[in-house]
Swiss-Prot record:
<feature type="region of interest" description="Disordered">
    <location>
        <begin position="198"/>
        <end position="227"/>
    </location>
</feature>
<comment type="similarity">
    <text>Belongs to the thymidine kinase family.</text>
</comment>
<dbReference type="GO" id="GO:0071897">
    <property type="term" value="P:DNA biosynthetic process"/>
</dbReference>
<feature type="compositionally biased region" description="Low complexity">
    <location>
        <begin position="217"/>
        <end position="227"/>
    </location>
</feature>
<feature type="binding site">
    <location>
        <position position="176"/>
    </location>
    <ligand>
        <name>Zn(2+)</name>
    </ligand>
</feature>
<dbReference type="Pfam" id="PF00265">
    <property type="entry name" value="TK"/>
</dbReference>
<feature type="binding site">
    <location>
        <begin position="15"/>
        <end position="22"/>
    </location>
    <ligand>
        <name>ATP</name>
    </ligand>
</feature>
<dbReference type="GO" id="GO:0046104">
    <property type="term" value="P:thymidine metabolic process"/>
</dbReference>
<dbReference type="GO" id="GO:0004797">
    <property type="term" value="F:thymidine kinase activity"/>
</dbReference>
<comment type="subunit">
    <text>Homotetramer.</text>
</comment>
<feature type="binding site">
    <location>
        <begin position="87"/>
        <end position="90"/>
    </location>
    <ligand>
        <name>ATP</name>
    </ligand>
</feature>
<protein>
    <recommendedName>
        <fullName>Thymidine kinase</fullName>
        <ecNumber>2.7.1.21</ecNumber>
    </recommendedName>
</protein>
<keyword id="KW-0237">DNA synthesis</keyword>
<keyword id="KW-0479">Metal-binding</keyword>
<keyword id="KW-0808">Transferase</keyword>
<keyword id="KW-0418">Kinase</keyword>
<dbReference type="GO" id="GO:0008270">
    <property type="term" value="F:zinc ion binding"/>
</dbReference>
Length: 227
């Protein structure tokens, strides 16, 4: 594709589950649309937790998306988008890295979102490689449902050793380093204030992003729909 513009760039938004990653992607996309930029959003076809054709945050904000089976399809479908969003990047294979590099070099702003570690707290490919080559990396934290500290781990609370287990509150909960257990644990009943802590996690994610990025804070003020 021959684009009459300067080289684009890559942004990575990472963190544990329930840290507000998808919410932050939606906020940045809304800001781009306010600036009259054309956006396209993609996600892995296997992610059907909330909708087949939308990216949906855990608090149910959403944007229309295109499910794809493999990263090269993104290059085929992106067309003239100024901003390309890619959610749940950890579910793609390593082809996502050269795909994102090519998109950025072709003039697109590429926003990649995903878990940086799996349920064993091990780096979740291809996220480490994407973080290494991105111009901007934002790491968000949830709130530990056990003690209330900042959480950077996704604790699996259902049986199973498969690395990929698509789920939400029924399968995972955010935990801090001290409360995290590398093996799945069984939670037989909801913890006190769990939903409140998850709501705070999203608020804290927005606040920490704005503190680190004054431009993002200005955008949040300008966009009345931002979370």
């Amino acid at each position: 594709m021959d684009r009459d513009r300067t080289t684009g760039w890559m942004e990575v938004i990472c963190g544990s589950m329930f840290s507000g990653k998808t919410e932050e992607l939606i906020r940045r996309l809304r800001r781009a649309r306010i600036a009259r930029q054309h956006t396209r959003v993609f996600k892995p076809a296997l992610d059907e937790r909330y909708s087949e054709d939308e990216v949906v945050s855990h608090n149910e904000n959403s944007v229309t998306t295109t499910p794809v089976e493999a990263p090269p399809q993104i290059q085929e479908l992106v067309q003239e988008a100024d901003v390309v969003g890619i959610d749940e990047a950890q579910f793609f294979d390593d082809d996502l890295v050269p795909t994102c590099q090519a998109l950025a070099e072709d003039g697109h702003r590429v926003i990649v979102v995903g878990l940086d570690t799996d349920y064993r707290a091990e780096p979740f490919d291809p996220m480490p490689q994407l973080m290494a080559v991105a111009e901007h990396v934002t790491k968000l934290h949830a709130v530990c449902v056990v003690c209330g500290a900042p959480a950077n781990h996704s604790q699996r609370i259902v049986p199973g050793e498969d690395r990929v287990l698509v789920g939400a509150t029924e399968a995972y909960e955010p935990r801090c380093r001290a409360c995290f257990e590398p093996e799945p644990v069984t939670v037989t009943r909801p913890r006190p204030h769990t939903e409140a802590l998850r709501a705070v996690a999203t608020d804290d994610a927005d606040a920490s992003t704005n503190e680190a990025d004054p431009e993002a804070a200005d955008a949040a003020s300008a966009d009345g729909t931002a979370a």
